[in-house]
């Protein structure tokens, strides 16, 4: 029981109870996350993870490229919320096709992507629609490196977040 408790007081007590519980019941040698636990606003959770209960073990984060694509000449992304997911791995054409099939199965109209080649150039279905003078800006905004693939989700804000969240966990 707590009198005149603030939100911070409740969080602190809750974290103490949870930490003690986890330490008591965790398998021997298992690491327990120390308090304070991360606090993520709903808005930030939807932007970075695409859901309001993110699995923080998944290292992928969603990137907001809406403003960038409003200035770009790629018309299908104009007046839409654009989210992107960057992954670093050598992916086969089959992987792209599997992800595209998943995207259409959840209701997306398609899934654009770009791969960063060894020479720093891009390869992918929307490469020719992004002006050369904007490619370096996109590389900087998304933190792209050689070997990365970036997937694009463009839709209304709520649906873009939901789709990006589902792709992030696929």
Regions found by a protein language model. Name each.
Residues 1-170:
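Class II aminoacyl-tRNA synthetase catalytic cores and aaRS-like
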């Amino acid at each position: 029981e707590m009198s005149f408790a603030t939100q911070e007081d409740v969080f602190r007590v809750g974290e103490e109870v949870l930490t003690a519980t986890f330490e008591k019941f965790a398998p021997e040698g298992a690491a327990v996350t120390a308090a304070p636990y991360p606090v993520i606003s709903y808005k930030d959770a939807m932007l970075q993870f695409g859901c309001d209960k993110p699995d923080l073990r998944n290292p992928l984060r969603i990137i907001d490229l809406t403003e960038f694509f409003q200035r770009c000449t790629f018309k299908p992304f104009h007046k839409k919320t654009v989210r992107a997911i960057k992954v670093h791995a050598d992916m086969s054409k089959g992987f792209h096709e599997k992800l595209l099939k998943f995207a259409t199965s959840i209701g997306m109209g398609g899934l654009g992507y770009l791969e960063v080649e060894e020479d720093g150039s891009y390869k992918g279905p929307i490469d020719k629609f992004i002006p050369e003078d904007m490619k370096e800006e996109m590389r900087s905004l998304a933190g792209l490196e050689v070997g990365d693939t970036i997937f694009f989700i463009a839709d209304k804000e709520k649906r873009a977040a939901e789709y990006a969240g589902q792709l992030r966990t696929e």
